Amino acid sequence: MDIEKMTTTMQEALGSAQQIAQVRHHQVIEVPHLWRIFVQPNSFGANFYKDLGIDLDDYTNLIEKEIDKINSVEGSNITYGQNLSPDLFQIFTEADKIAQKMGDEYLSTEIILLALFELKQNPLTSYLVSHGLTKAKAQAAIEKLRGGDKVTSQNAEETYKALEKYGVDLVAQVKSGKQDPVIGRDEEIRDVIRVLSRKTKNNPVLIGEPGVGKTAIVEGLAQRIVRKDVPENLKDKTIFSLDMGALIAGAKYRGEFEERLKAVLNEVKKSDGQIILFIDELHTIVGAGKTEGSMDAGNLLKPMLARGELHLIGATTLDEYRKYMETDKALERRFQKVLVTEPTVEDTISILRGLKERFEIHHGVTIHDNALVAAATLSNRYITDRFLPDKAIDLVDEASATIRVEMNSLPTELDQANRRLMQLEIEEAALKKERDDASKKRLEIIRGEIAELREENNQLKAQWEAEKKEVGNISEKRNELEHARHELEEAQNEGNLEKAAALRYGKIPEIEKELKAIEEKAKSDDLSLVQESVTEEQITEVVGRMTGIPITKLVEGEREKLLHLPETLHQRVVGQDEAVEAVSDAIIRARAGIQDPNRPLGSFLFLGPTGVGKTELAKALAENLFDSEEHMVRIDMSEYMEKHSVSRLVGAPPGYVGYDEGGQLTEAVRRNPYTIILLDEIEKAHPDVFNILLQVLDDGRLTDSKGVLVDFKNTVLIMTSNVGSQYLLDNVGENGEISEETTENVMSQLRAHFKPEFLNRIDDTILFKPLALEDIKNIIVKMTSQLSHRLEEMDVQLELSEEVKVWIAENAYEPAYGARPLKRYLTKVIENPLAKLIIGGKIPPKSKVIVTLVENKIDFDIQTIAE
């Protein structure tokens, strides 16, 4: 017996049998040791016996009992499991003879299984024979398994039933009702049928963007084959989806992958055109299994494709087809392209209506038609980096899953009642230990409350259970209806007209009637604790969660917040009414849903001197909309003064450092599509920057360096500039009004600095007025209030007299510099002296500091606050 002349699987089995013998302290390897390895789950031997009708659990128990009967030998110099027992040796001898007779080069597992029948007195043989498995039956099964092939490699077992092992029968899946219906796509399915019917080049490859339904087209073809809705040449054919991952996985030795693939191709070849092979992600065959000195899958397929021995359908994306398939011209020309375009919103709604029932059965929910329409329209508008129908199906699935999770969770009312009950029970336990009258009185009150709450709790729980049961009944009935419809389809395909008639005119209408009655009852009962409907509202919530864009219906609090947005912004930005109104209107338009869907929410150019609130307004808007001023994309345009730095906005071009990192502007918006973009000091940027912004301002789109389209339609663009600020400073009226002449001077300077095509695309150019003395006083109040808040944390109160505020305003006011000198002056005359007093221990906690003006100087009066 030469172990080198055994297949790899057989060698591994013998090694494992030896380990069992060593662990059990058995001197030799017996027949049950080896057979214990053969019947392990999913092994070759287990599948062989299972296919021949042997009860594996029963047979495994017998093998275990036989192993237990073998005597263990103990001792110091004894070697375990080094030799074969006479019975096992006889099996190998017989197997050698059978292998030679069959012309095999290696001894494989199935020959050993066959040789067992030579041990007629062995309990394992007796069991097989008594259960109807004879040597002749086993031999016939082996011949069928091999299909006339001889064992010429050490991986022979890997190549048996290769298609079953490395592929999925799509036609069988359709027959068993495991596939979702395919709606529409008739034209593409007809194209595939036409290509498959050709004499040469009869291998279609479906090319389209990810998520447009390429795989679904092949599933649709499988469904047509089952319904016999195909030409004669395709009737009774089978489509096998090849799993390239399973084919490559575990191929340890050189040539093993090629052997597996050749075995698959041989099975397809032997079927004489009855099997159509489907490879999803077709580009993976280029280079698959390629190691030094071996061929890749693409080269193995070429000869069969050229001779027309293989019917193959492929599916891949446009990018991957270009990258992998078009580089191998010999492989590419053997395929016929079928382009799969993205369906329209109307087609997507039809697809969703076809899938609706499947989702309802899976999740146990009711999906309203308005939810399907919303899923198609909202995904098309807001989820721009993916394709229909995939993204719309995802929304429906996600919304249904959300409702399903809520249905199984405790309702809010019941949860609150439980928490309150627990709280009272804890209080009751604590009061039981007290002996005073007040505690006893309180205990009585609590016990009364607990009794009431328990009653309420039990009622709510009973109501919840009843509602859940009602929803469960609907779900069960839907499942029953689905099963009956599948039975009807099977009966029609098999030509069993009697059964089909009984189902169509008897069972199905009866179930439909029962289902309608249950649904009507649920509607009239008005389920208040269990929400089982998926409506437009749930879809908008999912879209909002996925994109960060608020498109849900406005709740009352949010309406108030939006309507009072100008007043809220004025609390931070003093003066500048026109700017605040313009920005607020853009946001209100967006949330009302009436803005142009093909442009950004708003684009503004803020002009004015330094320190008047241009950047502050953008920050205030971000804080109001997103509760944090960090939630805005701020780009300081002074960093983009050189021509080469422009590429940082959209990403470095291929071949340059930083190509993989993406652009500062495009990446920020891609991650958070609903945002405020602040382009600060825009006049400092290189003129080429404005060329990039033209598409953003006009169409709300920008393509980054990788060719990915970034959507700017849900952003507010704010650009700030100091162009023409000198005119505003010199010529502003006494009441802060800007004259027409000044406006014209500023605009002419603006036109001289920026190109007309850039200025023409901006929604509004807003001139910020220089701050008047009254505005400065308001800003002082705001700044000192911020300082007061900081001091309150140290338990110190701050109070400024009115004359101090006026004095600071008059001394710090510089029209040319706006509010910024005010901050510096406040630090100098208030914050610095205060800091020294605190460090010196002059201002202890629980103090009040009153700031007054004494002889034109700031004076600090420190008082202790009475307890």
UniProtKB/Swiss-Prot annotation:
ATP 1 binds at residues 208-215. Its main location: cytoplasm. Residues 3-148 form the Clp R domain. GO terms for biological process: cellular response to heat; protein refolding. ATP 2 binds at residues 608-615. Residues 393-527 form a coiled coil. SUPFAM superfamilies: Double Clp-N motif, P-loop containing nucleoside triphosphate hydrolases. It is found in: Cytoplasm. Residues 771-867 are annotated as: C-terminal. Transmembrane segments: none annotated. Residues 343-548 are annotated as: Linker. CDD domains: AAA, RecA-like_ClpB_Hsp104-like. The Clp repeat (R) domain probably functions as a substrate-discriminating domain, recruiting aggregated proteins to the ClpB hexamer and/or stabilizing bound proteins. The NBD2 domain is responsible for oligomerization, whereas the NBD1 domain stabilizes the hexamer probably in an ATP-dependent manner. The movement of the coiled-coil domain is essential for ClpB ability to rescue proteins from an aggregated state, probably by pulling apart large aggregated proteins, which are bound between the coiled-coils motifs of adjacent ClpB subunits in the functional hexamer. This is Chaperone protein ClpB. It comes from Lactococcus lactis subsp. lactis (strain IL1403) (Streptococcus lactis). The lineage of its organism: Bacteria, Bacillati, Bacillota, Bacilli, Lactobacillales.
